[in-house]
Amino acid sequence: IYDKYADKGIKLVCRGMGTTGYGEHLLAKAFRADYHTVETVAHTTGCQKFYPDTTFVLDIGGQDMKAIWLNDGVITNIMLNEACSSGCGSFLENFASNLNIDVKDIAKRAFSSVSPAHLGSRCTVFMNSTIINEQRDGKNPDDIMAGLCRSIIENVFTKVVRVANTKELGEKVVVQGGTFRNRAVLRAIEEYLDMNVTLAPFPGEMGALGAALAAKKHIKEEGYANGESSSFIGFEAVKKFEYTTQSGVRCEHCGNHCLRNVLTF
């Protein structure tokens, strides 16, 4: 975006920077962010920008998922699945690769299925054997992909959310995260819940949007930490940003003496 405007002679000025996600603190240090916030809050903030009446947010990313309940805009409950990726995007990508299906074609192939495989909600290890059994029973790659898209949703509602009645999700269910760019997964959740759900306008970027909005709000209420401008290092500095990595560095801060990767910038 910066280069696009620069080519037209327009200089963009960053009024504030926010970070979130797994690299929240690291990136905040590296690029001198004005504010950082946890993922659940960032995703909720991004969602409420477009849908203030949201009652339930389901974010499915590449490696984890987040389920967030809201009441009058206030978070009332959060459930996470961080230990297992069997209901996430990487899970789907890995099996698509095994079936020689391009990621971009997953939804198309899934919708082409006449008889989706019944795979259930299993971890990756057991899913492999289940898929082999389904293939032996005559299921083709399209059927397997359709079954996997359904399996992701089954995993969410049997392993993470576990609601007795879908009414517990409220009337406004919003889904986001890059996995929902796959329309077959979107269709799977609507079929599973037997209700219409709302797809966020920028599924894979809602957390980033929420972090930006949180930074904007923080600056408006608290002001800048240093002077009257953002502490962000600047777009040109980001383009030239360099760092070094040291692997296998022994940590001496406690008796565990773990091996760490150290990034220096």
Where are these regions (language model features)?
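Adenine-nucleotide phosphate-binding core of ATP-dependent small-molecule kinases
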Residues: 129-158
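Glycine-rich phosphate-binding/hydrolytic loop that grips phosphoryl groups
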Residues: 45, 92-94, 200-233
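Phosphate/ATP-binding catalytic cores across multiple sugar-kinase/actin-like superfamilies
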Residues: 4, 147-170
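Glycine-rich phosphate-binding loops at beta-strand->alpha-helix junctions
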Residues: 20-23, 151, 164-192, 203-207
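Gly/Thr-rich phosphate-binding beta-strand-loop-beta motif of the actin/hexokinase/Hsp70
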Residues: 54-74, 250-264
